[in-house]
From Swiss-Prot:
Any single GO BP term: chromosome organization
Subunit comment: Interacts (via C-terminus) with capsid vertex component 2/CVC2.
Described function: Capsid vertex-specific component that plays a role during viral DNA encapsidation, assuring correct genome cleavage and presumably stabilizing capsids that contain full-length viral genomes.
Organism of provenance: Psittacid herpesvirus 1 (isolate Amazon parrot/-/97-0001/1997) (PsHV-1)
GO cellular component: host cell nucleus; viral capsid
UniProt keyword Protease, yes or no: no
Protein name: Capsid vertex component 1
Span list, region Disordered: 227-280, 795-815
Keywords in alphabetical order: Capsid protein, Host nucleus, Late protein, Viral genome packaging, Viral release from host cell, Virion
Keyword Transmembrane helix recorded: no
């Protein structure tokens, strides 16, 4: 919760309560440990006290444009992630005891997770967001420039307007019962003990009064919040298995209220003097109230609703009663409104619909009064406690929540930060599945000053699905002009992808894997160019007459050969040996000749390996980083590759190592070895040396041992900033190839900007003279051309940063 609270504070300082256009909505999420592991993140490094930080980039759907990388506040909980959300933190003042609050977990939902907040851009008119827009999250671990991991999500995974506040109904009762069992430490002073006992007595009175109307349970269960632990399956679970205890209690209370409401309507109609026809309509209204769960008013049902009336639809019967009762004299809600197809999925899934008027979006405050919490005067906690009786005649706490907050303040040490206001308000936790792994992702919505704060945003995918269903089309391009115009009226967020002609060549539009397809396309282009370059090099080095591949020694090494008499030139001719050419006919008994006969097969294995690698592996390779270095060198702006070795010297190569043997080949290096070449004493040969830094703190065992050609079963591939390549076999033999020449044939210059925005940063973002558009410090400054409603950069907020001494938290600069 700390990460979410600080992110909301900075966001509120920058944008206030505005939502839409240049002011993004902030979605608070928790990425489960299993989700991060499936993306290749070593979570054990996050939990072992290593420093790390997180960065976020928004990649807009249909235009290949994206925001700048921005560091966000992040906290990692190694286990029991929802403890950080639902339970007050009183560990500092608990005198080494176990915490008074606890949640019951099972083996499937006790996982940890990463707490971050993501900006969600939506149009200012309808507040719709494009669910296909991608969100890239990068984690840099151990402060190492090369130790980073990237995760890709979509807005549809990380931002949802539905909530589950109802599942939090019994949390305060459970926490109150748990704190009543707290044993007072003997070291407490008498005044502190007295205040605690007085407040606990008052709390017991309030609990007793509340328990007279419903059954209270002191067990807080994680499965009430985390609704699934495994990937979602097509068949929904049975209702008796999916329903939680809180929902059952709510249904019982709601049924009682429904019966009371129906009886009141029937009694009123019976006592009212009416004509016979009107009396029949009154009886019908009462029957409708009792049978359908929709209480009517005291008059005959009216089917004409006032335009713009709020649709009082909710997930529970209790919510329906409260919503319709609050309407008072407003127009009656018709049955068709309750059966609105756009809410069906949310209701069946146990979610609450968007809490706003669907006709005219009204942004709501989503965070509490941050000033009263952030601008704390540091006064002792115990001086602010209101005792239950005696002591100055102060007003006793009137609710369980007030008592609970005061008791937590007493347990905490004096001078510690105050409890977050979010902890003592309703909290919604919605579980979604990651598209790539099926692992759970939590979307958290906090209350607004104790009131439920429903997200004002709406997913444009809902309007898109309705338009396609009504037209009988399977793709947005199949819609006619009128249907497209109606879709854009309901969901302006699709204005750019609907008109995307240029991006259609590189992206799979209106697809959850749109960004992945774009990245795979980049990998395919580079792989094709690499294979072509190697094919050209092999063709040039092949003796057409003898049909043998001739390998020259490139790196200067002394070769140990058993029989010098069989060597070309005889004994004492090692300099000539070093530059000699070997084929299958000359010196057939020596390993250089055997290597020459196997070289073509090894190159073929290497090409197959390139084609089958994942993009995550490819993005860390020396081949891709050399291409980035080349693009950065050609760009007019001063840029640095993101967390990649950057060397513009053409004598410096980034090498990937592949080990061969037993009929296969596998990559050895994760990040490339950076090696400098220089002329050797022997004419025509090269010497080389490592210039990489020390081994990564994350992997201290990864010590550089072998230069290219030193190990008997390593095939080494290196590229410099000019995309000149070296393919080095054991012994220093190899081929030279030109990747830049073949890459130009398959690379589109329109891709340069998209690649640089994703894999580099402007050199003067951190330090240096400020740019003229310093307002671009906001995350959305560079997306003015991405959507019509982002026309200019917003005002720049003051830098909001915080430093934490915990190894699980990061120093941050927020949106």
């Amino acid at each position: 919760m700390e990460a979410h609270f600080v992110a909301a504070a900075a966001h509120s300082a920058a944008f206030g309560d505005r939502v839409g256009g240049e002011s993004p909505y902030l979605s608070h999420i928790v990425l489960s440990e299993r989700c991060m592991v499936n993306f290749g993140v070593p979570t054990f490094l996050l939990a072992s006290g290593n420093n790390f930080y997180a960065e976020v980039q928004i990649r807009f759907h249909g235009c290949l444009q994206c925001t700048q990388w921005r560091r966000v506040f992040s906290v990692y909980a190694p286990s029991s992630a929802i403890d950080r959300i639902l339970l007050p933190d009183v560990s500092s003042g608990n005198c080494g005891r176990s915490a008074p609050f606890r949640i019951m977990y099972d083996s499937g939902n006790s996982w940890g997770g990463l707490f971050i907040s993501v900006p969600v851009f939506c149009d200012p008119e309808k507040l719709t967001f494009d669910g296909y827009t991608a969100v890239a999250v990068r984690l840099a671990i151990c402060g190492s420039a090369d130790e980073f991991y990237e995760m890709l999500f979509t807005y549809d995974e990380l931002a949802q307007p539905q909530t589950r506040f109802y599942a939090d109904a019994g949390r305060f009762d459970a926490l109150a019962l748990q704190i009543c069992e707290y044993h007072i430490p003997a070291a407490w002073p008498s005044r502190r003990k007295e205040e605690f006992l007085n407040l606990r007595g008052r709390l017991l009175e309030l609990i007793a009064a509340r328990g007279s109307t419903r059954q209270l349970d002191k067990v807080l269960r994680a499965d009430s919040y985390i609704t699934h632990e495994q990937p979602l399956v097509p068949d929904p679970p049975k209702e008796d298995e999916a329903a939680s205890e809180a929902k059952k209690k709510e249904a019982d209370d709601a049924m009682k209220k429904l019966k009371d409401a129906a009886a009141k309507v029937a009694s009123s109609d019976a006592n009212r003097q009416r004509e016979p026809g009107d009396r029949e309509q009154g009886v019908s209204a009462a029957l409708l109230s009792t049978c359908s769960g929709m209480p009517g008013d005291h008059h005959a049902p009216q089917h004409a609703a006032v335009a713009g009336a709020v649709k009082a639809v909710a997930s529970g019967l209790n919510s329906i009663v409260r919503g319709l009762s609050a309407a008072g004299g407003a127009a009656a809600t018709s049955a068709s409104q309750l059966a609105d197809i756009r809410y069906t999925d949310a209701l069946l899934a146990g979610l609450e619909p968007p809490g706003r008027n669907r006709g005219e979006p009204r942004p709501q405050r989503r965070v509490p009064d941050l000033e009263s919490v952030v601008m704390d005067d540091g006064q002792s906690r115990h001086d602010r406690v209101i005792p239950a009786s005696g002591l100055g005649g102060a007003r006793a706490p009137a609710s369980v929540e007030e008592c609970l907050k005061a008791l937590c303040a007493i347990i905490s040490d004096p001078g510690t930060p105050p409890q977050s206001a979010w902890t003592f308000g309703p909290i919604s936790i919605v579980t979604h599945s990651c598209y790539n792994s099926g692992s759970p992702i939590l979307i958290v919505t906090y209350s607004d000053g104790g009131r439920r704060a429903y997200p004002p945003i709406v997913s444009g995918i809902t309007a898109l699905s309705e338009a396609l269903l009504a037209a009988g089309a399977s793709f947005p391009s199949d819609l006619n002009e009128d249907e497209k115009a109606e879709l854009l009226r309901k969901a302006p967020c699709f204005a750019r992808p609907m008109a995307a002609d240029e991006a259609r060549e590189y992206q799979k539009l209106f697809s959850v894997d749109s960004e992945q397809v774009f990245l795979f396309g980049l990998q395919a282009r580079v792989t094709t160019a690499m294979i072509t370059a190697l094919t050209v090099a092999v063709a040039r080095a092949t003796d057409q007459a003898a049909d043998n591949l001739l390998l020259n020694q490139i790196v200067s090494y002394d070769l140990a050969v058993r029989d010098d008499d069989d060597l070309p030139g005889g004994r004492g001719q090692r300099d000539r040996l070093a530059v000699a050419q070997y084929d299958g006919d000359r010196a057939a008994g020596h390993w250089p000749a055997k290597l020459a006969s196997q070289a073509a097969d090894l190159i073929a294995w290497f090409c197959v390996n390139l084609q089958t690698e994942s993009f995550a592996t490819f993005a860390r390779s020396g081949v891709w980083k050399a291409i980035l270095t080349s693009l950065v060198a050609e760009d007019t702006l001063h840029r640095l590759p993101f967390l990649a070795p950057f060397h513009s010297d053409p004598a410096i190569y980034m090498f990937d190592y592949f080990r061969f043997g037993a009929g296969n080949m596998s990559r050895v290096t994760g990040d490339p070895n950076v090696i400098r070449f220089k002329p050797a004493l022997r004419t025509g040969l090269m010497d080389c040396e490592f210039i990489s830094g020390a081994a990564s703190p994350a992997h201290p065992w990864a010590v550089h041992k072998f230069l290219p050609g030193q190990f008997h079963s390593y095939l080494c591939v290196g590229l410099n900033s000019e995309l000149e390549g070296l393919l080095i076999f054991p012994g220093g033999f190899g081929l030279r190839f030109d990747l830049g020449e073949t890459l130009d044939e398959v690379w589109d210059k329109n891709l340069d900007r998209a690649v640089l925005d994703r894999y580099s940063r402007l050199a003067n973002i951190s330090g240096g003279p400020p740019r003229a558009d310093r307002g671009a410090d906001c995350a959305i400054a560079d997306v003015g051309c991405a959507y019509p409603y982002l026309k200019s950069a917003p005002r720049a907020p003051s830098d909001f940063s915080t430093t934490s001494t915990s190894g699980h938290e990061s120093v941050t600069i927020l949106y």
